[in-house]
From Swiss-Prot:
Pfam families: PRAI (PF00697). The keyword DNA-binding does not apply. The gene is trpF. One of its GO terms (molecular function) is phosphoribosylanthranilate isomerase activity. This is N-(5'-phosphoribosyl)anthranilate isomerase. GO terms for biological process: L-tryptophan biosynthetic process.
């Protein structure tokens, strides 16, 4: 069985503005995600990412997100932006992901027929060195679409983040249903792609804390 975390970690992804990152830090968010995947509406240049990196508060993880990027591109980001975690959303294999000597998370798509074949053993065999997994509706991420949470692999002893259509309105139920290590949100706290909404950010954090408090009190 999974051991429930004492509290649910929070990752705000697709950050593009310094002010949004500062507010995330003030709200006690555990990690901020910076996207380097080509074609993303939240894509950052390395120079923009460095400017954001300088404003991140201590003890907040910086997660660099990639999707089928070249090794050279990733090495450049690792060297200049100095992320504390890497996140891979493409066809990257374990050997590639661990080349960069930074802990990594692997995104697993959960929508469609492909998700029916996902099991814990398969994940461990394919990504034995992953620090954790992110279960999202689609590989691309940031789609705002949910998936059937009952499809999550059972007996997963690695930390996992729940993503895909998570919002301030449904994150309480999502935590109650899946008891994740963390939740990962992007479009659910936005006014438009890359532009976060301060009120939604606050509400999201409040709902996560409410869910944690209810669980710790043993309230079903």
């Amino acid at each position: 069985m999974n051991i429930p975390p004492y509290r649910t970690r929070i990752k705000f992804c697709g950050m593009t503005r310094v002010g949004d990152v500062r507010l995330a830090s003030e709200l006690g968010v555990d990690a901020v995600g910076l996207i380097f995947a080509s074609g993303s509406s939240r894509l950052l240049t390395v120079s923009a990412a460095c400017a954001i990196r300088r404003t991140v508060a201590p003890m907040v993880d910086v997660v660099a997100l990639f999707q089928n990027n070249s090794a050279d591109e990733i090495h450049t980001v690792v060297r200049t932006v100095r992320p504390t975690l890497l996140q891979f959303h493409g066809k990257e294999e374990d050997a590639f992901c661990r080349t960069f000597n930074v802990p990594y998370l692997k995104a697993i798509p959960m929508a469609g027929a492909e998700a029916k074949r996902i099991c814990t053993r398969t994940l461990y065999l394919k990504y034995p060195n992953a620090a954790g997994f992110i279960f999202d509706s689609h590989l691309k991420g940031g789609t705002g679409q949910t998936f059937d949470w009952s499809r999550l692999p059972i007996d997963l002893h690695h930390p996992f983040l729940l993503a895909g259509g998570i919002t301030p309105e449904n994150v309480f139920d999502a935590i109650a249903a899946t008891v994740p290590w963390g939740v990962d949100v992007s479009s659910g706290i936005e006014l438009q792609p890359g532009i976060k909404d301060g009120d939604k950010m606050r509400q999201f954090v409040e709902e996560v804390r409410r869910a944690d408090g209810r669980r710790l009190l043993g309230v079903p």
